[in-house]
């Protein structure tokens, strides 16, 4: 009985390996699978067209910006490569539609683009207008500091009390947001993100309150000039957006993103995460899915 069970398990293990290998070598391409989707689904239309139209921007590093050769790069752009690879086994099979952030939702709903990948925060208001994919990044607010600064860590900033100075982009909740983290800090509100960071560069403040992705990007570019205080708060989810009502298209994109973030086809995602945030992805384990 025990021997039979062991033999049976051996066959299952062997079969499992065989199936996994078969999945790598001979998985059904998306184009062949399109026959299973609804005739009205965008999935079928995109596959028939031969490329996916991606709405994004071009002026916001590290998300979407032009490199020294004029090529669009960034974490959002990497997600477009991932989607194109999932669709056509060709990470270059897409067309970028460059757009203003204000055009993100209109361009989805008018059909100008198939999907928007443009550092779009998921919230309940937007979710009434478009359908969001699974998140591909968790953003937050952080304190960008200097490695030679007197108060480069959050602990030292907190201990500095009213002597600690922080710059932040001007908005109605700016001062309150800082004081929730540093109750006694002096808050310098400025009109542009560039000026917020310039205040740190010039020594007018001890820290600049910016997106965590900005902190990671600048620290990756200039570790001699910028440091991460180690403190972050107010988490926000970034996801891609598609038109509502097309379950086949949404589920396909989700599946492609899941495999890129959590599964085996993670080369593009991992490289982009390191290139633009300076961090290596670790912790993927077999067994219980962390999704």
Predicted regions and their residues:
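Acidic, polar ligand-binding/catalytic clefts
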Residues: 29-30, 81, 85, 93-159, ...
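Periplasmic-binding protein-like
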Residues: 58, 137-148, 212-257, 276-291
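N-terminal secretory signal peptides
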Residues: 1-7, 20
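Extended ligand-binding regions for polar small-molecule ligands
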Residues: 36-37, 81-82, 86, 148-149, ...
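N-terminal export leaders
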Residues: 7-16
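A ligand-binding cleft/hinge motif common to bilobed small-molecule-binding domains
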Residues: 103, 119-129, 180, 197-235
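Short helix-initiation/N-cap motifs at beta->coil->alpha
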Residues: 94-106, 188-198, 236
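Extracytoplasmic small-molecule ligand-binding "clamshell" domains
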Residues: 39-116, 128
